Every structure is written in structure tokens, then in C-alpha cells.
């Protein structure tokens, strides 16, 4: 049975965050109000759920410091086994068992030594414990009704606060690191990150560019576009949208369970489409309902005569689970033909991409069930719906965007790195792909950057042989095996070096890449002779090896404030804001 505790005059359920525990206690009290004798079924069900949420080695109200200490303990457990078990294969099996009983996915490395080094590293345990804890925390929030249109859409307020704080810490950490390449160019790491797909603006722009290319190819092929919304059965939804109350059909599924269900539905539909000779291509976007349950939006292009059969196949497999429940036939699969008179397929999808990136030109977030999500004050700041969606995808590890039936994007990105002189003798389709990837700009008299020649993904698709080519695309990424020094030793990794044409794989077109190193990371360490009356030799009389040794720098007094203010610890003041000064040492 749940343990009731009292703090500052407020009773709550032990093991839950206080605001959650107070509400859970109130619901328990309401369930047993006026009851004499055996407890009613409602009380037993709620008590059993609370016991399941609080019965864990990591309580839901655990701090990040407690998770770090637990990581140290479990890493030491693995290290203790390493001291007594000397066979690498046997030791690996033992450590995989330790991970399994603690609910952690063991390392998937093939090398036994790599697995052992990870399992004896507290940092590896911290990363995995945080992931497991965050998902357990968020699942508990869903089951307790803390994720809904009224309480906080998509994710709980605590999780979105934690994610925003994490992003800020990551940004500060990147800004504090300077990188230098072999040409002597120096950049702060956050500036380098902004030049890649970690930059949301660039990522959104690339997605729009790629989909616009698909739209152009569909028009050339005289294919039609179909906008599809695919949702889960009722048992995956924790909260009823209209009443904002607990769904009696809910069976404890997580958003990842919902995503796995939709993936299975799509896999079965795709297999049936192959048997029927239907080959759709396009883009799918994963979004959360107000209660965190995943649903899909897809824009699929196909031949006009295939639309009807495609819809039948999708509905058949989507309704295979609980297809007779109320509303299933009306809401499980929704399709809408894209009308060119109302706008292009790119315009249909633009809103859904913006909802997942920056809320630009979106207006209100309106879910498929009619729930409106607006910016909401959480603590001392206003959290936008896009920030909640980003936190939702991060905590559950859900891939939000995926293209279907189009050429891979990695050769596109690698081709952009190639200099013009490297492809002078390349086949025409390689040259066409290179030209499609290049964007040319100029600066006007006001200092504004003007694009004189935009990149064209449709041309790239044609150069690759078109859509729906499977493994038969013309251009591939060239790679070489390189030994990379990592945290856990040398690892052989496939590093991209350029592209090659499938018809002549022995001819490679090298891309421009740089070797980056962190400035100021390496610190010279040398031996220092003892200073005592016994050995007080001068530099001239000292042995050559001692005279050549570098003297170590004076070590300042230890200050743990930087460590506690790093990624390893969250430090919040009474207003919920990050404040590293709380850990400043005082006399």
C-alpha cells in the first residue's frame, strides 16, 4: 500500500514529487471516503498503480545527484567483478547480467574490452540511468494525469523545464570550447554546431527543400498526393480529450509503445502494398497528442489508380487491433487528397514542420482531437508548444521525420563538400548532382545575403535515378576504416571521405574535411624531483633525464563549484532557475 508522509503540514504519497504526491493522496482519500470495511475497487486500483510507480531503486523524486551516486555505486560493482573475473568473455556476460537486472540496456559493442570499459565507467551509467529515469518519470506523469491539455500538453512541466535547462547548459558548454583545424582556423564549438543539422533553422530548411523536390518529381510523374493521419487505438491514450479525465480503456502504454504500434501498422501496410504493386513515396511526421500518445501525419505520392487500394490496405491493418471500438472507423485513419487548387503539398506540410521546430506561422497548436495548445508559463518563463514537442521527442527517443522512397540524404550532404575541380572528369549525373547541391549567394548594398542560385533537390533525385530505386541509386558515400581514439580506447569506425558512382565504384571523388582538435586540452605533465636536504641538486648536476623533465604547474586549491555546475548536476534556486553560485565554497 502507498506510504503516506506529511511535510510542512501537507500529506502526500511518499516516493512521488510533492505536487504529484499531494494530488495522489487527495484521490486516495476521495476513493475511500466514508468506506467502512473492505476498500472499494477504485481505491485498490489506484493504490496498486501508486505502488508500481514508487517501488523502484530510483524513486521518482530522486535528484540528479542521487542518480550520479547510484551510477558510481553500480560502476564500482562492475569494477569489483573485474578484479576477480579475468576472462573477458565471462566478465562481459557478468556485466551484461548486472545491467539487465537494473533495467539498463547493455552496451552493444562487439569488442569485449569496449563493453567492460563502459560498464566500469560512472559516466556511462549516468547517461543510461538518466535516460531510464526520465522515461519512467514521464510515464508516471502520464499515468497520473500530469500530461494533458490543461495540466501541460505533450510532456509534464517538470520534464520540459529539465530539457530547457539541459539545452542551456549544453549551449554554455559548447561556447566554452574552442576547436582548431589543421589550417589554423579556430571556432567556438557552438558556432561549429550551428553550421550543421543541429541548427534547427538549417534542419527545417533542408526538410522543406527535400520535400519540395519530392513534390516537383511527383508533378513530373503525374502522381497525386494524399495527406494521411494515422492514430492509435483507445488503449494507448491516457487522457480523454473532451473531458480531460483518465481514459478507462488506458492500459499503461508509453509513447514509445504507441510509436512501435504505428511502425508495425506501417510495416504491414508496406508489405501489402509491395504485393499489390503499389509504391508510395513521401514524408511522415510523428507528433504527440495532448496526452503524449504518438500519431503520424504523412504526405504520400502515388499513381492516381493506386489511391483507393492504398487506403484500403492502410485501414485494414490500422483496424486490426480493436477495430470495432467506438470511433475507430471514423478516426483511426483519416485521408485527404491534396488539391493543387488549394496549394502545393509542400504548403500542406509546412505547418506540421513548423509545429515541431519554431511555431513560425502556425498560430495555435490544434491536435486532431481538437485540443488547443498555447504558450504556457512554467516557473518563471513561458514555454512554447514547439519546446514541449522537442522535449517529448527527446525524452522518448522518437524520430520525428522520415522520408519514404526517396534517395538518401547522406550523399547529398557529402556532395556539397566536394570542390568543383574534383568532379571535372565525373559522369554527367554526378556533375548534375553536384550542381543541384550547390547554393550560390551574394551580398547586396545593404549587407543582406541574397540567394542567386538555390539548391534543387528535384535535380538531385533525377541524378540519383529517380524515386523508389531502393539499393539501385547511382551515387553512394565513399568510406574508409579509421581507428578513432575515444573515451574507451581505439575504435574502428567508417569515416566518410567523399562519393563514388555505383557504375564505377573504384573511382572516388574526395570531399573536403578537416581534422579538429580542442585548443588547450592537452597539458604537459612531467616528473619533478623531490626538494629535500638529501637531494638538492642543481640543474647542471642533475641527470639528463631529470633536467629535461617539465616541471608541473602549481595546483590551485580544489573548487568543486565548476563540477557541480556541469552536466552532471542540476542546481536550482528557490525560483527553479539554474544557479551555480549555490555550490560556491565558503570559508
Region spans (language model):
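Short hydrophobic/aromatic beta-strand micro-patches
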Residues: 299-303
Amino acid at each position: 500500500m502507498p506510504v503516506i508522509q506529511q511535510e510542512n503540514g501537507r500529506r502526500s504519497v511518499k516516493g512521488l514529487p510533492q505536487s504529484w504526491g499531494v494530488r495522489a493522496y487527495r484521490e486516495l482519500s476521495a476513493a475511500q471516503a466514508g468506506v467502512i470495511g473492505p476498500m472499494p475497487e477504485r481505491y485498490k486500483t489506484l493504490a496498486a498503480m501508486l505502488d508500481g510507480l514508487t517501488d523502484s531503486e530510483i524513486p521518482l523524486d530522486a535528484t540528479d545527484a542521487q542518480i550520479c551516486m547510484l551510477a558510481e555505486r553500480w560502476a564500482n560493482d562492475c569494477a569489483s567483478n573485474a578484479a576477480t573475473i579475468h576472462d573477458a568473455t565471462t566478465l562481459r556476460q557478468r556485466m551484461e547480467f548486472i545491467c539487465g537486472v537494473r533495467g539498463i540496456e547493455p552496451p552493444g559493442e562487439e569488442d569485449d574490452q569496449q563493453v567492460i570499459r563502459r560498464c566500469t565507467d560512472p559516466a556511462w551509467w549516468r547517461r543510461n540511468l538518466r535516460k531510464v529515469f526520465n522515461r519512467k518519470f514521464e510515464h508516471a506523469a502520464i499515468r497520473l494525469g500530469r500530461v494533458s491539455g490543461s495540466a501541460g500538453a505533450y510532456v509534464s512541466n517538470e520534464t520540459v523545464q529539465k530539457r530547457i535547462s539541459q539545452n542551456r547548459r549544453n549551449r554554455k558548454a559548447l561556447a566554452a570550447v574552442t576547436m582548431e583545424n589543421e589550417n589554423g582556423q579556430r571556432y567556438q564549438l557552438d558556432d561549429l554546431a550551428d553550421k550543421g543539422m543541429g541548427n534547427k533553422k538549417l534542419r527545417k530548411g533542408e526538410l522543406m527543400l527535400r520535400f519540395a523536390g519530392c513534390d516537383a518529381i511527383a508533378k513530373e510523374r503525374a502522381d497525386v498526393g494524399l495527406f494521411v493521419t494515422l492514430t492509435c487505438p483507445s488503449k494507448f491514450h491516457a487522457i480523454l480529450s473532451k473531458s480531460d479525465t483518465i481514459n478507462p480503456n488506458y492500459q499503461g502504454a508509453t509513447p514509445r509503445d504507441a510509436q512501435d504500434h504505428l511502425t508495425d501498422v506501417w510495416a504491414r501496410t508496406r508489405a501489402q502494398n509491395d504485393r499489390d504493386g503499389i509504391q508510395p513515396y513521401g514524408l511522415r511526421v510523428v507528433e504527440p497528442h495532448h496526452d503524449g500518445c504518438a500519431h503520424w501525419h504523412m504526405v504520400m505520392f502515388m499513381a492516381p489508380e493506386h489511391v483507393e487500394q492504398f487506403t484500403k490496405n492502410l485501414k485494414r491493418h490500422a483496424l486490426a487491433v480493436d477495430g470495432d471500438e467506438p470511433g475507430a472507423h471514423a478516426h483511426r485513419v483519416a485521408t485527404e487528397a491534396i488539391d493543387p487548387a488549394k496549394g502545393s503539398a509542400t504548403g500542406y506540410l509546412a505547418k506540421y514542420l513548423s509545429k515541431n521546430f519554431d511555431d513560425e506561422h502556425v498560430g495555435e497548436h490544434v491536435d486532431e482531437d481538437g485540443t488547443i495548445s498555447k504558450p504556457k508559463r512554467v516557473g518563471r518563463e513561458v514555454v512554447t508548444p514547439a519546446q514541449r514537442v522537442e522535449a517529448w521527442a527527446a525524452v522518448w527517443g522518437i524520430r520525428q521525420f522520415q522520408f519514404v522512397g526517396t534517395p538518401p540524404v547522406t550523399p547529398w550532404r557529402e556532395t556539397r563538400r566536394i570542390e568543383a575541380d574534383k568532379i571535372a572528369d565525373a559522369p554527367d549525373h554526378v556533375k548534375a548532382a553536384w550542381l543541384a547541391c550547390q547554393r550560390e549567394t551574394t551580398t547586396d548594398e545593404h549587407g543582406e545575403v541574397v540567394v542567386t542560385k538555390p539548391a534543387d533537390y528535384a535535380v538531385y533525385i533525377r541524378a540519383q535515378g529517380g524515386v523508389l530505386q531502393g539499393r539501385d541509386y547511382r551515387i553512394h558515400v565513399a568510406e574508409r576504416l579509421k581507428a578513432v581514439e575515444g573515451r574507451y580506447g581505439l575504435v574502428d569506425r567508417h569515416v566518410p571521405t567523399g562519393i563514388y558512382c555505383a557504375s564505377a565504384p573504384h573511382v572516388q571523388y574526395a570531399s573536403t574535411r578537416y581534422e579538429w582538435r580542442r585548443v588547450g586540452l592537452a597539458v604537459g605533465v612531467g616528473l619533478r624531483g623531490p626538494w629535500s636536504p638529501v637531494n638538492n641538486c642543481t640543474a647542471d648536476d642533475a641527470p639528463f633525464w631529470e633536467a629535461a623533465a617539465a616541471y608541473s604547474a602549481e595546483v590551485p586549491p580544489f573548487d568543486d563549484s565548476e563540477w557541480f555546475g556541469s552536466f552532471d548536476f542540476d542546481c536550482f534556486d528557490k525560483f527553479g532557475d539554474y544557479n551555480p553560485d549555490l555550490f560556491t565554497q565558503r570559508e
